[in-house]
């Protein structure tokens, strides 16, 4: 499990707790801040999941990963020349 995945889950849980406290004390700003932390945590976890997937792919198929990288580089360089 990547560091980003762990951080994302922790931030998500902290956001859920903060939202719950905001609802409990009837503080909409605190609740909204908790919702934002929860969303940020989910994004961070998804980023970590993506890193894990890409890392696994590169380890399993290094030549395919190299070919994909070369193709993307070629396309980007062609687009930037215009």
Swiss-Prot record:
Coiled coil: none annotated. It comes from Pseudomonas putida (strain ATCC 47054 / DSM 6125 / CFBP 8728 / NCIMB 11950 / KT2440). This is UPF0337 protein PP_2059. It comes from the Bacteria. Signal peptide: none annotated. Belongs to the UPF0337 (CsbD) family. Transmembrane segments: none annotated.
